[in-house]
């Protein structure tokens, strides 16, 4: 059986500000932005452009969901953005005003730093050690 995770839902306050952040600051590609009139919502998918999962940007449909914007994993790192050049991407992100909450560090598995997205979700920027 061959399976893969295709989409990860990320609850956002506003579609357009989230699209702007992910496409302009992280260089993600906007894969789809389709209005669904029967549900009065948009189907918005962004991707880092390589193989793997994409993000489905979803606005909350009830107050319980809204409460988790920026804290979908209870303060733990939520997503891991792999790169082939840590310092290139780190410096680019810093120049665009992205907040790093843990500075770059060499670990046995690679170089890593933790940044916050526009809502406060924590991400690892990581370049894995070549084996």
Regions flagged by a language model, labelled:
Residues 18-23, 93, 120:
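Conserved active-site tyrosine of GNAT-family acetyltransferases
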Residues 1-7, 29-81, 90-116, 126-131:
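Vicinal oxygen chelate
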Residues 14-15, 84-87:
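Helix N-cap motif at beta-to-alpha junctions
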Residues 12-15, 37-39:
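Conserved beta-strand-loop-alpha-helix junction that forms the acyl-donor binding cleft
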Residues 85, 117-120:
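Short linear motifs centered on Gly/Pro in flexible linkers and helix caps
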Residues 4, 11-12, 18:
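Glycine/serine-rich loop-strand microenvironments at binding/catalytic pocket rims
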């Amino acid at each position: 059986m061959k399976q893969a995770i295709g989409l990860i839902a990320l609850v956002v306050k506003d579609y357009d500000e989230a699209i702007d952040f992910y496409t302009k600051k992280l260089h993600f590609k906007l894969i789809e932005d389709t209005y669904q009139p029967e549900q009065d919502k948009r189907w918005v998918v962004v991707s880092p452009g390589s193989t793997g999962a994409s993000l489905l940007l979803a606005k909350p449909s009830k107050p319980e969901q809204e409460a988790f914007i920026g804290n979908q994993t209870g303060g733990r790192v939520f997503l891991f953005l792999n790169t082939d050049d840590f310092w290139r991407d780190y410096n680019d992100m810093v120049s665009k005003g992205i907040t790093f909450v843990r500075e770059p560090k060499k670990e046995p598995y690679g170089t890593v730093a933790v940044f916050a997205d526009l809502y406060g979700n924590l991400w690892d920027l990581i370049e894995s050690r070549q084996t």
